[in-house]
C-alpha cells in the first residue's frame, strides 16, 4: 500500500514523463538552433515544455565569451543538481560550449547524459527518441514576436 507521500511523488513523476525542457543561452544563433530543434521535436510528436515541467533537459550553450561560458557552466551545474535530486531524468548539453570543450566537460561533468556540438542535431534528436526529418530543413518554431525573427548566416 502506498502512503500519501509516495502517491504524490508517483503522480508528479508521471505528469513529467517524456517532456523536454529546452534551455537556450547565448546569442541569436542559439535561439535559431533551438527553434529548429523545437520544430524537429514537434514533427516527431515530442512535448517541449517550460522549465519545471520537463523530465528531460537540453541546455543549448554558448562558449565564446567568458560571461557566456560561465552562465552555461552554471546552468549545467544547476541541472546536474536537479538530476541528482531526481527532479529530472536526463540531461543533454549542446551548442558552442559543448562543441569547443566537449572532452573537458565530459571529464568535469560526467553526470550529463551526452554532449553534442553545433552540427550534431541528428544525433541529439536520436538521443531524445526522435528522427531527423530532412524535409524540415530550415523549418522551425519561432519564439520571437511575429514582427521579427532570427536568421542564421553562419555557424
Report residues per predicted region.
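Proteins enriched for Cys/Gly/acidic motifs involved in redox and nucleic-acid/cofactor modification
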Residues: 1-155
Amino acid at each position: 500500500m502506498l502512503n500519501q507521500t509516495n502517491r504524490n511523488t508517483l503522480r508528479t513523476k508521471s505528469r513529467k514523463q517524456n517532456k523536454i525542457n529546452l534551455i537556450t543561452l547565448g546569442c541569436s544563433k542559439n535561439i535559431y538552433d533551438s527553434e529548429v530543434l523545437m520544430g524537429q521535436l514537434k514533427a516527431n510528436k515530442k512535448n517541449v515544455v517550460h522549465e519545471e515541467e520537463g523530465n528531460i533537459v537540453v541546455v543549448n550553450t554558448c562558449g565564446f565569451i567568458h560571461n557566456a561560458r560561465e552562465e552555461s557552466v552554471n546552468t549545467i551545474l544547476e541541472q546536474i543538481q536537479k538530476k541528482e535530486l531526481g527532479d529530472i531524468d536526463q540531461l543533454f548539453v549542446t551548442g558552442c560550449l559543448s562543441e569547443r570543450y566537449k572532452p573537458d566537460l565530459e571529464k568535469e561533468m560526467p553526470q550529463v547524459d551526452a554532449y553534442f556540438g553545433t552540427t550534431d542535431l541528428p544525433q541529439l534528436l536520436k538521443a531524445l527518441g526522435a528522427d531527423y526529418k530532412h524535409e524540415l530543413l530550415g523549418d522551425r518554431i519561432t519564439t520571437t514576436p511575429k514582427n521579427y525573427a532570427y536568421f542564421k548566416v553562419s555557424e
